[in-house]
């Protein structure tokens, strides 16, 4: 039996366990309704906290537990949104680290890595949805770089712990700075194994990230196992011909600063973990 009325239809979809619908679905369900009537009904439903505008033509369904918040946690709908937008994605950086239990505090943003051009960042009453464009993802994201995490609404594509750790070094500003990255790495590295990286990793992660992660793991965090794994990767895949870089690419190189020959890094900043009380 066809449901009469947009609100009953929205509630029926919620009862099915759905958390989002599209304008195209509404047009299909109510072909007799004009565009103006559909949008007017959606506006009233939004005012009554039945739905929230997730994107143009993409609406979030708000169960009673989320109605007062006027939104949903991005992790509950990001997979559906990115499929709606037709863009490859993975939850990355601090948001991925949190999923792996390595975030010392809940990130203020939910970070999604995707292809160029990225969607605009979006803020609601709960959190900010931040998109980081990675041009290497323009050709898609290999499954080897992802983990599919099961959630109550389906699955979430998340960068692997190894890709997450390396990406934190590629985008330190988005990740709270190098000292905060160091804090996250203390726990994240416990879930990493760099001895079995996919062959395609070099096409997606700059070699400088391996250098910085290797130095920070071995020389600061004293994780010699991870350090050796990363150094072996550098030797095998670059034949030792990687260039000298600065630890902090945003800071000038100190003329009298320490230089690590093993990692070919000019140590131009002093990193202290946020968890270090000294």
Each PLM stretch: what is its role?
Residues 2-88, 190-211, 217-218:
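Short beta-edge/loop segments at beta->alpha junctions of small alpha/beta modules
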Residues 26, 96, 165:
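A residue-level signal for conserved active-site and pocket-lining positions in enzyme catalytic cores
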Residues 31, 86, 101, 170-173:
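Hydrophobic/aromatic-lined pockets within catalytic cores
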Residues 34-37, 104-106, 173-177:
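Short amphipathic alpha-helical segments with coiled-coil-like heptad repeat character
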Residues 53-64, 71-137:
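Short gly/ser-rich loop at a beta-strand->alpha-helix junction or flexible surface loop bordering the NTP-binding
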Residues 130-153:
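A short, charged helix-loop
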Residues 145-278:
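Hydrophobic alpha-helical interaction segments
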């Amino acid at each position: 039996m066809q449901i009469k009325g947009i609100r009953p239809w929205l509630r029926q979809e919620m009862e099915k366990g759905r958390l989002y619908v599209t304008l195209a679905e509404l047009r299909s369900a109510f072909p007799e309704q004009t565009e103006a009537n559909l949008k007017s009904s959606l506006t009233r439903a939004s005012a009554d906290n039945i739905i929230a505008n997730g994107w143009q033509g993409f609406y979030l369904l708000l169960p009673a537990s989320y109605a007062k918040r006027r939104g949903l946690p991005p992790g509950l709908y990001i997979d559906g949104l990115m499929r709606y937008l037709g863009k490859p994605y993975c939850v990355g950086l601090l948001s991925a680290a949190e999923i792996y239990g390595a975030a010392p505090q809940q990130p203020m943003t939910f970070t999604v890595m995707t292809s160029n051009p990225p969607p605009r960042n979006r803020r609601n009453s709960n959190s900010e949805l931040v998109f980081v464009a990675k041009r290497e993802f323009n050709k898609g994201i290999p499954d080897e770089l992802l983990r599919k995490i099961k959630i109550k609404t389906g699955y979430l594509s998340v960068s692997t712990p190894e890709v997450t750790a390396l990406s934190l070094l590629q985008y330190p500003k988005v990740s709270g700075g190098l000292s905060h990255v160091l804090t996250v790495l203390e726990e994240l590295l416990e879930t990493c194994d760099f001895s079995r990286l996919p062959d395609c990793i070099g096409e997606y992660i700059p070699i400088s990230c391996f250098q910085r992660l290797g130095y920070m793991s071995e020389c600061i965090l004293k994780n010699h196992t991870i350090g050796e794994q990363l150094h072996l990767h550098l030797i095998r895949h670059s034949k030792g011909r990687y260039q000298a870089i600065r630890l902090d690419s945003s800071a000038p190189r100190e003329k009298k600063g320490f230089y690590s020959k093993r990692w070919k890094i000019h140590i131009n900043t002093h990193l202290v973990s946020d968890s270090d009380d000294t």
